[in-house]
């Protein structure tokens, strides 16, 4: 009886929720008071041509820091589940010529593309999260081609820690000038210029390096766990 009543209760509650929402919210007339203010003032106030960057780092930068904390917690939990990285299996053969040559060719390209996406995040769509994923891919591909050559987890941890410290320090510096935490400092500059938007490019660089180091370490740990598992 309870098994049958559960889906019915869920469906009834969901239908009631939809009814309340449709009855209270006017259809076709969304309330965008905050959005209009951001669209009208972000470019002149923050100096970022990419309005999304203004929202992510300036208007709700504390949420972005929370997202970084969630990513750190997820990577830490995954690392604990996988266990301490053991010694890489030296007997495991490297990939074929095409895989090795492709990884060697793509590594510098991915580094350049990743840094470009990060450093231009305040000008064009992209930013630290997207560029960080590209940077992580650049360091994971060589591991897939040559399993015996694994980047140092200690070096990745240092980069991750320093990037996080720079993000928090940049945000805390605003407190010294009697501003809110993570308020953009420095001059907004000329809209559309590479050196503009105050400290937002610094924050995005910290985000990109932190995301790249965390994701690269996690994916490389996955490859190590697969190599250590019995065949």
Role assignments for model-derived ranges:
Residues 118-127:
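Membrane-interface helix caps and helix-loop-helix hairpins in membrane proteins
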Residues 70-79, 136-139, 143, 203-218:
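Hydrophobic cores of alpha-helical transmembrane segments in multi-pass inner/ER membrane proteins
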Residues 75-101, 225-231:
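Cytoplasmic juxtamembrane regions at transmembrane-helix boundaries
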Residues 156-186:
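A structural-propensity feature for long, helix-poor, extended segments
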Residues 126-135:
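Structural signature of hydrophobic alpha-helical transmembrane segments
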Residues 40-47, 52-65, 190-205:
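Short aromatic-rich membrane-water interface segments that cap or initiate transmembrane helices
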Residues 1-16, 152-164:
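Alpha-helical transmembrane segments and their helix-start/interface "positive-inside/aromatic belt" motifs
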Residues 23-45, 182:
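Interfacial/capping segments of alpha-helical transmembrane domains
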